[in-house]
Amino acid sequence: VKKVFVKTGNFEKFQAAIRAVEARGAPEAGWLLVAGDPARGKSTIVDKWAAQTGAIYLRGKEQWTPSFFLAELAGQLKIDDSLRGKARFQAVITRIGAEQMPVVVDEVQHAMRDNAAVLEVLRDITDLTETIAVLVAGVDDVMRRLARPSLKQIASRIAQVVEFQPNDLGDTALVCQQLADVEIAPDLVAEVHRQSRGLMRPICNAIAGIEAHANRNKLPKVKLADLAGQELCHDWQSRRPQLVKVAAGGR
């Protein structure tokens, strides 16, 4: 499977939301919340954007406290680790403000403990520097938790919400076209889409299996009939493989 970044519909929605946040009227309302079930490409897309823009990328951790968060942020910025308390905070503010560096917090549910104390620190940082923050929700109840009255000051900083959806058939075809080292016929693309339900991880796993079959059989192009009766995607919930079925006369 090729290491290529595919610009799917979710990527385009994310880019549009970033542009809207950049054009915001209220400087303090500079947060973007990215939501959606796992395997929809949230982290991959946001990580790509962070790398392109020079954003600070942090992955939330179960043990996060405000001081732990600030220490990790300072570490990413290569700030003198002997600084503590107000001195460390001021150094972070100075660096982020001077370079207008966005901050990404992936798995933001881990920043919700103790009435979102970590996000209160992030709010102070973005308010003082007027920079953008991107929050990536790894679970589906983050939006509900952010809607609590006690968190209205934090929620008011969110200017845009992007909810990632499963890839449609067109996006699945685009992923197959750009990531596969072998040509995948439209009928097999449709089967990949059906079995994967448009989720990125199963799509990539299916592509890897198709490539392996093509290499074993020296096929420049793989059709649905070529994989009849073989496993394409594994359904872990039912604990059994999903086999490719070909209609009678389809071979």
Predicted features along the sequence, with ranges:
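Pre-Walker A (Motif I) flank of P-loop NTPase domains
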Residues: G25-L32
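Conserved catalytic segments around the Walker B and adjacent sensor/switch elements
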Residues: A50-Q63
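C-terminal alpha-helical "lid" subdomain
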Residues: V1-A16, A39, S43-K48, Q165, ...
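Short, well-ordered alpha-helices that flank and scaffold nucleotide-derived cofactor binding pockets
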Residues: D47-A51, G75, D124-D127, A212
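Mid-core helix/loop region of P-loop NTP-binding domains shared across ATPases and GTPases
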Residues: T65-A71, D80-T131, A147, N167-T172, ...
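A structured, charge-rich N-terminal accessory region that forms the first stable segment of a protein
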Residues: A16, A20-G25
